[in-house]
Structures are given as structure tokens and as C-alpha cells.
Amino acid sequence: MTVSPRTSLGRLVPALLVSQVGFYVALLTPVQLLLTLRLSDLAGDDATSAFGIVTGAGALVALVFNPIAGRISDRTLWRFGRRRTWILTGSLAGAAALVALGAATSVWQVVLLWAFVQALFNFQYAATNALVADQVPAERRGGVSGLVGLTIAVGPLAGLALANGFEAGSARQWQAVAAVAAIAGVLAVVLLRDTRGVRGRGGENFLRTFWINPRHHPAFGWAWLVRFLITCAYASSSYNAFYLLQRFDVAEDEVGGMVLQLSLISVVLLAVTSVSAGYLSDAVRRQKPFIVFAGVVAAVALVLMAFAPSLAFVYVATGLLGIGTGAFFAIDLAMCVRVLPSTDDAGKDLAIINIANSLPQSVVPFVAPLLLAIGGYTALFGFLALLGVLGAVSVRRVPEIGQEHDESGRTAPITRHDLVSRTASDERTLA
């Protein structure tokens, strides 16, 4: 069998960025705007509750399908490539589901179609994330992670800008978002050179492979918890449209433009923070201080949102959230890749980590109606601020660069043998 070279960074990084932007255009544009408009038409005064049901159901589907997609990608033996296959399939099929969602005529259709969208695009997402572990050199992961972190803001910003070019609530908004997602998937596949997957071990129990014992891999477990807590804090952006409509009485035909303005502020600050934090982390060989910073900044911003007496405070808080988001997503992916139990199972293991991205999309909409009923947006944002602080505290249990946890939970330095073993494992996956 001929060993294929990995994708050069000059092609790999653009492929990662394009694929991730397409993913976030597809999923975050609806969450931040399109679903609000669609459900306001279909559910009227019950739109907030319907939004919670739709996004909660979609997040549960993502929770299930992301690790399954990662495992299938790890074990895909087709010549087209274990990651390319599912980036292309997920983006094209997911785009078709988005088009169908734009034509939905009832809330239950929105629930069903959004679940399909989540399932399909999570195949693309799992395969794309695994490429960082597959092909990015360890000493470059901070910088690459910082660039990839930009996509969580650039994606929905591009999607919001695109959607605002069409009539609010129209099917054309959904079609435009779907077209961008499909094109992004195709471009990423064209840029990538890929490898075949690893054959499953004889007698391997499919379901059992999804359990990673946190006692045996404590660093992995703590990294998962940190991502979950801080992602919950940043899930506040899902309620921006409702927040503006209900607390500040922004007109429905103006809310899209205002959400876009807030996103512009966030993305500019996120871009500066994400790129600089990623490269600075590689330079100083430290990751944890950046995560602590992100959690604390999120908490401060959410407290401002909770007690904002005017829109000026909302703009300031949004800027702080952009700074914190940039610092977090610049470092978090690199940190999670570093504590993976096995490079052969990178797709599945990163997908399990990504449950910490999906679960907040269920948890926050589930608890939000209760918190809103108790204390309005002050209670909701105050609760999310507390989670941000807990995430900042929890990261102290994750080992810093150059150390990993042994089975007893103590930290031990990564040895030359460990590095050689990981490199050899990577080379065995090349086809």
C-alpha cells in the first residue's frame, strides 16, 4: 500500500476554515435569527417555548450523532478518505434539509427537520475536527486552533449578513444559508488530502467504545467538563434576538439588523483575541491561563447583560463576550487534542468532547424558561455567569502542556517514547 503524504498546512488550514465556516453558517444562523423569525410566524406568543423545544431536540440529536459520526469516520476505509467522505456527505445532505426547513408550515415540522439538520452536519463537524489531531503538528496546534476559533464568529456573521439580504422570515434566507454550507463542504474536500481509517479490532464492542473512563483518563474528563461549563456561558447568544425583542422592545423588522451589529462587534474582537491568543499560547507553551481568562470574562459580560439598563451596556457586554470567546476557542481545541486517549480514535474521542458543545444547547433551553419565569433575563444571565466561573476554576485540574495524567490521576511528563508512539500511530493511519 502506498503511503500518501498529509495535506500541507497551506491547504489544510484553508480547508479547516472553510468547512468550519460552512458548519457554523448552517447551524448558528438559524439559532441566532432564522428559527426565531420562523417560529414567531408559526407559534406566535408561544415562540419562546417552541424555540426551546426545537433547539433542545436538535441538541439532543447532535449529542447522539456526533460521537457516532466520529466513530464511523475513524473506521471508514474508502479510498476517498475517512474525513473527506463525511465532510462532503454531511454538508450536501444537511444543506438539502435546510432548504426543506425553510418551507416548513408547522412547529412539529421545524422540530423534525432541525433534528435532521443537526444529525447531518454533525457528520461534517466530527470529521473536520478530527483533522486537527490527524494532520496538524503538535507545535502548531495553538495557532491553528486560534484560526479555527475564528469560525464560530465568522460563520454566523456571514450567515446573518447573507440572511439580511433577503426578506425577513422568507424561504430564500434558508436557501441562501444552505447554498453557502454546501459550497463550503465541496471546497474543503477539494483542498484536502486524506487517509483511510483504521480497521476495528476483532470483537470490538461498538457501544462500549464510546465510554472513556474518567478515572483512567482524568485529563480528558476535566477538559470535557471545562468545555461544557464555559460553552454553557457562551450559549447566551442564542437568546439575543428574544432578549432584544422582550427587554428593550426592539421591533421585529429591526431585530435582525441589531443582532448583526452585535455580531460585528463580537467578531472583530474575537478575531484579534483568537489569533493572538493561539500564537501566544504556542510561544509560551501555556494554555490554562487563557481558559481561565475566557471563563472570567464571560462571567463579567453576562453580569452586565443581566443588569443592563440600556442598549449601550448590551454593546459593551457583547464586546467582552467576543474577547472571551476568542480566547477560549483559540486554546480549547488544542488543549482537548492534547489529552485525547488515542490518536487512532481521534474522530470518536473528539466527538465525545464535542458533546460538551452540544449538551449546552439542550441544557440552556431546558432551564431558560424556568429561570426566565423566576427572574427574567437577570436570572438567566446570572446563572450562566456562574457556570463561566466554575469552568475557569475547573481548568486547574487539566495538566499543562508537557504533562499528562497517568492512570492514578497524578501528572507525569510526556516522554520521548510517548511522542514516538503517537507519531507511529498517526503514520499507521495513512493510506
Indicate residue ranges for each PLM-predicted region:
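Loop-to-transmembrane helix entry/capping segments in MFS-fold secondary transporters
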Residues: 46-49, 138-147, 256, 343-353
